[in-house]
Swiss-Prot record:
PANTHER family documented for this protein: UPF0210 PROTEIN MJ1665 (PTHR37560:SF1), UPF0210 PROTEIN SPR0218 (PTHR37560)
Assembly with partners or alone: Homodimer.
InterPro entries for this protein: UPF0210
Taxonomic superkingdom: Bacteria
Pfam families the UniProt entry points to: DUF711 (PF05167)
Family assignment from sequence similarity: Belongs to the UPF0210 family.
Organism of provenance: Listeria monocytogenes serovar 1/2a (strain ATCC BAA-679 / EGD-e)
Protein name according to UniProt: UPF0210 protein lmo0534
Length: 451
């Protein structure tokens, strides 16, 4: 590399908050299935602790060697509904506790995969797991849960959508002492991906290798600084600038993934190209959009600005990396983005605009606080809307919403750390009860028939 490129990378890290957001080790638990739940849990604990024993140490060694901040070291596992489903257990909270204990033992901050895939229907394991999610999240610290309720090929399982509204509500109540923190670790998906390194939606797909390393990069501050240098230029120039910047960011992710793979003796999977914000000043996706010329995110033009950003990040990132995957786009989590928080407080950004933006961006309605008296049916209807956007547009969408008990519009919900602070946003006051009560399945769209 030329000296100026090395200096540029150092500046990106020191001044523009460029970092590797996560190194996530995906671990298959398919060989841990057992008719005896206790035996299965012992196998699960042993496998996770054995495979991930050096994950945190290797991450820290790479940080020291290259001077690249690696914010999180995490683990994803095969959806537990599949693994626990072979046991005779009638409650899976003990499986969640096993995951939690393993995560603490190896020192990772989150473990994902307390999950069920029910886009077309339930198995016994799915039913038990989904029913146990509120207690599992209330009784663990590091476990993340996700449920896939729809896909472009199968349509939307509206029975699962209805149930997830109830699950979110119950989770908020059981974790009311932490302002509904359990809901921040629960994601409802359509078109969930099998190699996502980001929490809370990560799980290790059944089509994946026994063990793999996936990397999630992040650099909103770097992209914003690059756009500052092309003020007033046409969008062609803006797109090209973002592309070139995304290339540099992703190159770093590729390097870290390869080195981690070699040091751990585990195959390198993918780099997720997502721009993931944090609550820190200078690390905001909203501020990138505003740098393109919007007075505040949420105003007219926001969706178009996000479309340009998302597409340019993918085009630049794909050139820099052998295998891309995960969610790959821009995240717009309200509580984790200083610009989003401000826009909500100023009344510039509402749920309806966020929903429009999710037709473009990486995920969906993410880290949004709504009033504590929001009904389970309203939450389910929000999930149905997001799932419909994902299913019709053949993309991943998701809902991570927090109906924090006792809160009303305008209150602030404090999570701390990377999860940030969420202003409580108003929801539509009209009822969706009869709509959600129908149940059944919304059929797959006509363009899903590809064969």
């Amino acid at each position: 590399m030329e000296t100026n490129q090395i200096l540029e990378t150092i500046r990106m890290i020191e001044e523009e908050k460029l970092d590797i957001r996560t190194i996530t080790m995906g671990i298959s638990l398919l060989d841990c299935m057992d008719g005896d739940g206790e035996a299965a849990r012992k196998k699960i604990y042993q496998k996770i602790v054995t495979k991930a024993r050096n994950l945190v140490a290797v991450g820290e060694a790479i940080e020291s060697e290259f001077g690249i901040p690696i914010i999180n070291k995490r683990i994803s596992v095969t959806p537990i509904a599949i693994i626990a489903g072979s046991s005779a257990d009638t409650d899976y909270v003990e499986f969640a506790k096993t995951l939690d204990a393993a995560a603490k033992e190896v020192g990772v901050n989150f473990i994902g995969g307390y999950s069920a895939l029910v886009q077309k229907g339930y198995t016994k394991g799915d039913e038990i797991l989904i029913r146990s999610i509120p207690q599992a999240l209330a009784q663990t610290e590091r476990v993340c849960s996700s449920v896939n309720v729809g896909s472009t090929r199968t349509g939307i399982n509206m029975d699962a959508v209805r149930q997830m509204g109830e699950v979110i509500k119950e989770t908020a109540d059981l974790t009311a002492d932490t302002q509904g923190l359990g809901c921040a670790k629960l994601v409802v998906f359509a078109n969930a991906v099998e190699d996502n390194p980001f929490m809370a939606g990560a799980f290790h797909g059944v089509g994946e290798a026994d063990c793999v390393i996936n990397v999630g990069v992040s650099g909103p501050g770097v992209v914003k600084r690059a756009i500052e240098k092309v003020k007033g230029e046409p969008f062609d120039i803006v797109a090209e600038t973002v592309k070139q910047t995304a290339f540099k960011i992703t190159r770093m992710g590729q390097l870290v993934g390869q080195v981690a793979s070699e040091k751990l003796g585990v195959p390198f999977g993918i780099v997720d190209l997502s721009l993931a914000p944090t609550p820190a000043i200078g690390d905001s996706v909203a501020h990138i959009l505003e740098e393109m010329g919007l007075e505040m995110v949420g105003t007219h033009g926001t969706t178009a600005a996000l479309a340009l950003l998302n597409d340019a990040v993918k085009k630049g990132g794909v050139m820099a990396c052998g295998h891309v995957g995960g969610l790959s786009g821009a995240f717009i989590p309200v509580s984790e983005d200083a610009g989003m928080i401000e826009a909500v407080q100023q009344g510039a950004l509402n749920l309806e605009k966020l929903e429009a933006m999710t037709a473009i961006c990486s995920v969906g309605l993410d880290m949004i606080a709504v009033p504590g008296d929001t009904t389970a049916e309203t939450l389910a209807a929000m999930i149905a809307d997001e799932a419909a956007i994902g299913v019709i547009n053949n993309k991943t969408t998701a809902v991570r919403v927090i109906p924090a008990s006792g809160t009303k519009v305008g209150d602030m919900v404090e999570f701390g750390g990377l999860l940030g602070t969420a202003p409580v946003m108003p929801v539509n006051g009209k009822s969706s009860v009869d709509f959600i009560a129908r149940g059944g399945r919304i059929p797959a769209p006509i363009h899903s028939f590809k064969n």
